[in-house]
Amino acid sequence: MQIFVKTLTGKTITLEVESSDTIDNVKQKIQDKEGIPPDQQRLIFAGKQLEDGRTLSDYNIQKESTLHLVLRLRGGMQIFVKTLTGKTITLEVESSDTIDNVKQKIQDKEGIPPDQQRLIFAGKQLEDGRTLSDYNIQKESTLHLVLRLRGGMQIFVKTLTGKTITLEVESSDTIDNVKQKIQDKEGIPPDQQRLIFAGKQLEDGRTLSDYNIQKESTLHLVLRLRGGMQIFVKTLTGKTITLEVESSDTIDNVKQKIQDKEGIPPDQQRLIFAGKQLEDGRTLSDYNIQKESTLHLVLRLRGGQ
């Protein structure tokens, strides 16, 4: 169904929703349209602030209802972040924000990945899981941003096509971290990556230093095709989508791949095989789905009007 969201500036946003959508989902859709982070949004309907975990139907929000969007300024404040170059960044934060949140805001403004940021206040390095109020950081406080170069180094990743990727890493980075960096650069999902060094396949939870990988070492990237296979997904329009999967992939993974290809959110997808609706947490092998099997994709309209 359609609902409307009215902002304090008078702008009205139209959203496609289902009555089973949670308030979190709605805030996500608003972020997608308007770029406003969910944690800055307060949604009001019939004079009541809506809670994230509840659904539209819980609040009896029906088609063409109008919600009001207010930006959260409760506890909101400005703080400053000073870099080693002398640049000062101004951030809108709340005292309940975690250090992770602050690093994310710095990334949004400056493009510096959180894992390269160290934040210092009153001579103390701030820990990710703690909040600004834990450190008694108040409005117009100044934090200092230091880039983490401890153990920082370049390594190379060579693909089977002969392409070489350069990565900025630290010896304390895990293999998971490295795969994430490769995804950021090349778009290859971590679960399709196998990394080889000195003839040995590297395990996700281990660090570069565990494997004695030093600056300017070269890793080899092999795409995981063990158990890999193609399956087909047929839509009601008759379109057939081809997916590269593994029998150990969960139905969630498959829905994610469909979203990547077709843009259909996983929560709108129902997948059918052999007359049975497939459950998210189960794997393809649980359902005996083999190479070149065909699944049927039905769009969830339950609650939609």
UniProtKB/Swiss-Prot annotation:
The keyword Mitochondrion does not apply. Residues 305 form a propeptide. Its main location: cytoplasm. Pfam families: ubiquitin. One of its GO terms (biological process) is modification-dependent protein catabolic process. Belongs to the ubiquitin family. This is Polyubiquitin. It comes from Neurospora crassa (strain ATCC 24698 / 74-OR23-1A / CBS 708.71 / DSM 1257 / FGSC 987).
